[in-house]
Swiss-Prot record:
Active site residues per record: 181
Enzyme class label: transferase
Organism listed in the record: Vibrio atlanticus (strain LGP32) (Vibrio splendidus (strain Mel32))
Similarity comment text for this entry: Belongs to the PanB family.
Binding of 3-methyl-2-oxobutanoate, residues: 45-46, 84, 112
Annotated Gene3D superfamilies: Phosphoenolpyruvate-binding domains
Quaternary assembly: Homodecamer; pentamer of dimers.
Molecular function GO terms recorded: 3-methyl-2-oxobutanoate hydroxymethyltransferase activity; magnesium ion binding
Lineage of the organism: Bacteria, Pseudomonadati, Pseudomonadota, Gammaproteobacteria, Vibrionales
InterPro entries: Pantoate_hydroxy_MeTrfase, Pyrv/PenolPyrv_kinase-like_dom, Pyrv_kinase-like_dom_sf
Catalysed transformations (reactions): 3-methyl-2-oxobutanoate + (6R)-5,10-methylene-5,6,7,8-tetrahydrofolate + H2O = 2-dehydropantoate + (6S)-5,6,7,8-tetrahydrofolate
GO BP of this protein: pantothenate biosynthetic process
Keyword Oxidoreductase recorded: no
Protein name: 3-methyl-2-oxobutanoate hydroxymethyltransferase
Length: 264
C-alpha cells in the first residue's frame, strides 16, 4: 500500500468513491489492516473500553494514546493515522497544542477532537501549527455524562441544524475531516453534502464519504454488546484478513451499512 494522505481522501470524496477505516491499537492488527490496504486507522480512546475494560473512555490519558499510536505506526507505516485526543486533553487551545504535539511525535498524521463550535479557536490554533484535525460530532463519548448515556444525537430540527452549522464552522476553522457518530442518516446526508472535506460515519448510514468501525465490533469480539450499527464480519468469513477485506469491499460498494445497521 502506498502512503495515504488527506489528499487521497479528498480525491475519494470528489470522485464519489467511498472508503473504509477502522480503529487499531497494536502493531499486529495494524499490520493486518495494512495488508488489506486499509487507508485510514484511528487509535481511539475506545481503547479504554475494549482494551482496559473501563465503563467509558474518560480514564484514557494522552500517554495511553501515544503508546498505542507508536505501536500502530510500527505495524502500518503507510496508513493515514489518526489519534484521539482524550478527555480534558484539549480544554484550552494551548493545552491542545501541547498534547497534540505528543501524539504527532508518536506517529499520528492527524488528531481527532470531540465537540462543536466551541472548538473553533482550538482547531485554528492546531492547524496553524501544522496539526491536522478531525472534528467529531454527534454522539461524542467523552460527553456521556452530559448526554445521560450513549444516545442518538440530532433527531430534532434544532439539534440537527446546529450540527450542520458546527460541521461547517469547524471545516472553515481548518478541520480536514468530519466524523459523525450515531446520527440519523438524513442528517449525515445533509452534512456530507454541505462539507467540502471528507465525512466519515459510524452509525450514520451509508451516505457519508467513509465508514469506521471499532475493530473489536468488526470481529465480533467486543466484551459487552454489539451496537446496532456494527456488523460481525468475522462470523461471515471465519478469517480475520477475509473479514477486513469483506468490510472494505462492502463499504466501498455502499452495501454496508445497510438498513439493518442504520439509525433512522
Amino acid at each position: 500500500m502506498k502512503k495515504v494522505t488527506i489528499n487521497d481522501l479528498i480525491k475519494c470524496k470528489q470522485e464519489g468513491r467511498k472508503f473504509a477505516t477502522s480503529t487499531a491499537y497494536d502493531a499486529s492488527f495494524a499490520q493486518l489492516f495494512e495488508s488489506q490496504d486499509m487507508p485510514v486507522l484511528l487509535v481511539g480512546d475506545s481503547l479504554g473500553m475494549v482494551l482496559q475494560g473501563r465503563n467509558d473512555t474518560l480514564p484514557v490519558t494522552v500517554e495511553d494514546i501515544a503508546y498505542h499510536t507508536r505501536s500502530v505506526r510500527a505495524g502500518s507505516p503507510n496508513c493515514l493515522l489518526m489519534a484521539d485526543m482524550p478527555f480534558m486533553s484539549y480544554a484550552t487551545p494551548e493545552q491542545a497544542c501541547e498534547n497534540a504535539a505528543t501524539l504527532m511525535r508518536a506517529g499520528a498524521n492527524m488528531v481527532k477532537i470531540e465537540g462543536g463550535s466551541w472548538l473553533i479557536e482550538t482547531v485554528k490554533m492546531l492547524t496553524e501549527r501544522a496539526v491536522p484535525v478531525c472534528a467529531h460530532l454527534g454522539l461524542t463519548p467523552q460527553s456521556v455524562n452530559i448526554f445521560g448515556g450513549y444516545k442518538v444525537q440530532g433527531r430534532d430540527n434544532e439539534q440537527a441544524d446546529k450540527m450542520v452549522a458546527d460541521a461547517l464552522a469547524l471545516q472553515n476553522a481548518g478541520a480536514q475531516i468530519v466524523l459523525l457518530e450515531c446520527v440519523p442518516a438524513s442528517l449525515a446526508k445533509r452534512i456530507t453534502e454541505a462539507c467540502d472535506v471528507p465525512v466519515i460515519g459510524i452509525g450514520a448510514g451509508n451516505v457519508t464519504d467513509g465508514q469506521i468501525l471499532v475493530m473489536h465490533d468488526m470481529f465480533g469480539i467486543s466484551a459487552n454488546y454489539m451496537p446496532k450499527f456494527s456488523k460481525n464480519f468475522l462470523a461471515e468469513t471465519g478469517d480475520m484478513r477475509k473479514a477486513v477485506a469483506l468490510y472494505k469491499e462492502e463499504v466501498e460498494s455502499a452495501l454496508f451499512p445497510d438498513d439493518a445497521h442504520t439509525i433512522a
